[in-house]
Amino acid sequence: MRSLLLFTFSACVLLARALLAGGASSGGGDTGPGNRRREREALAAQKIEVLVLLPRDDSYLFSLARVRPAIEYALRSVEGNGTGRKLLPPGTRFQVAYEDSDCGNRALFSLVDRVAAARGAKPDLILGPVCEYAAAPVARLASHWDLPMLSAGALAAGFQHKDTEYSHLTRVAPAYAKMGEMMLALFRHHHWSRAALLYSDDKLERNCYFTLEGVHEVFQEEGLHTSAYNFDETKDLDLDDIVRYIQGSERVVIMCASGDTIRRIMLAVHRHGMTSGDYAFFNIELFNSSSYGDGSWKRGDKHDFEAKQAYSSLQTVTLLRTAKPEFEKFSMEVKSSVEKQGLNEEDYVNMFVEGFHDAILLYVLALHEVLRAGYSKKDGGKIIQQTWNRTFEGIAGQVSIDANGDRYGDFSVVAMTDTEAGTQEVIGDYFGKEGRFKMRSNVKYPWGSLKLRIDETRIVEHTNSSPCKSCGLEESAVTGIVVGALLGAGLLMAFYFFRKKYRITIERRNHQEESNIGKHRELREDSIRSHFSVA
């Protein structure tokens, strides 16, 4: 009996172990069928479908012709012997489709049309768009469809709200708000609290509007005062009105416009005596292109001398450039590819070109981690979360993405350090991840010290101190004005004497006529009386 009980107990223990083992293998453990399927997917070769939405119009700094070579360079790196081969399953390939975004609704239509044509099959990754009005609807749909979207654009302040409609967007280029943080650090360094925002606004793509919107929002949050003035530089500029606005607003002016427009404004304020240290002018040039102001005063025209003097009061804000050996190779390959398409320019590698290259690297890093965790390439939300709050090595140096999916921005301030030669150098740098602004100690500052002292409360007496006596007018124009004034005075005097003589003549004639009329009246009256009396 005792042996029977022992046998029964042993059998129950074995059965329980078997049941537990079976439950572990079939119930939600790490080795269940669902997880084994995910592991197989993670180890299997991946076909990553990428949709690139950028404009074909080469007037844009981020056109397909400019950015495509950078994307293909990155893909060769990750598919070849680079980091991608170590991170992704063997045999993984990227299939890329390039569509014209036209910087408008065509971007959204292209995405919807491709999904419809593929019977609902969606891309695994969206790169772009850049233009704000093109990116907004695509980002909303990407969030709805659970698609990761990486862009070196969509830089406006509105895209930083990632809690709802932009939840699947990562910005791999510094947003305008990051530049606003840099300006805030610069103002704190100089102990300034007020700024005038002066910008061009074409009411279409509104690049400068969105640029200075980032400054305005950051300043407003920190209690700094701003006033704003906008103009359309595609039309005739009222430079006098712009000067009056500056004189009546703030002493520190932040501007965004084309290089030629900035030069015209600086010449105007210089001719009104506003470049002698009472004002500080800043020009935003994030994209290293003349479209947004190239910071150069020289044009080879008769105004170069004045412009050089005026630019001694202008500082230019641009991206901090770092370079490593691989970047030089990358730049040469991009330049070669772009030139083959008939584009010849000085700056082949700009912020957008770098950004989309780094977007591929960031996506590969995130996808690797998601696959290792047992998820698939279709888990867009998981992938996009892995792109946030991390630092990785980009083509030009370290790239840091904050916890909100926006890249930290490193910026430099360029100023004229030699007023005789007109030489401009970097005088200070801002490091976005650290939130630190630092002036360089090995350069000569145009104002002579580390801090530019601007008294924001002192009233300035504005005088026209143009070095040219005619205030910018040609000598012949001045001569014409003087001769015209003399002729006008002569005509007025001639008219006065003619009018006086004519008046005397008229008065004499009227007097004679009145005398004759009186005589005729007397004769007629005498005749009537004579005849009446006779009757």
Swiss-Prot record:
Molecular functions per Gene Ontology: chloride ion binding; G protein-coupled peptide receptor activity; hormone binding; identical protein binding; natriuretic peptide receptor activity; peptide binding; peptide hormone binding; protein homodimerization activity
Topology within the bilayer: Single-pass type I membrane protein
Cystine residue pairs: 103-131, 208-256
Subcellular location(s) per record: Cell membrane
Glycosylated position list: 81, 288, 389
Transmembrane residue ranges: 478-498
SUPFAM superfamilies associated with the record: Periplasmic binding protein-like I
Keywords: Cell membrane, Disulfide bond, Glycoprotein, Membrane, Receptor, Signal, Transmembrane, Transmembrane helix
Signal sequence residues: 1-26
CDD domains (alphabetical): PBP1_NPR_C, TM_EphA1
Propeptide boundaries: 27-40
Keyword Cell cycle: no
Regions of this protein lying in the Extracellular compartment: 41-477
Keyword Cell membrane part of the UniProt annotation: yes
Cellular component GO terms, alphabetical: plasma membrane; protein-containing complex
All ranges on the Cytoplasmic side of the membrane: 499-535
Function: Receptor for the natriuretic peptide hormones, binding with similar affinities atrial natriuretic peptide NPPA/ANP, brain natriuretic peptide NPPB/BNP, and C-type natriuretic peptide NPPC/CNP. May function as a clearance receptor for NPPA, NPPB and NPPC, regulating their local concentrations and effects. Acts as a regulator of osteoblast differentiation and bone growth by binding to its ligand osteocrin, thereby preventing binding between NPR3/NPR-C and natriuretic peptides, leading to increase cGMP production.
Stated family: Belongs to the ANF receptor family.
Summary of subunit composition and partner proteins: Homodimer; disulfide-linked. Interacts with OSTN.
Other comments on record: Has low affinity for peptide hormones in the absence of bound chloride.
The protein's name in its UniProt record: Atrial natriuretic peptide receptor 3
Protein source organism: Rattus norvegicus (Rat)
Name of encoding gene: Npr3
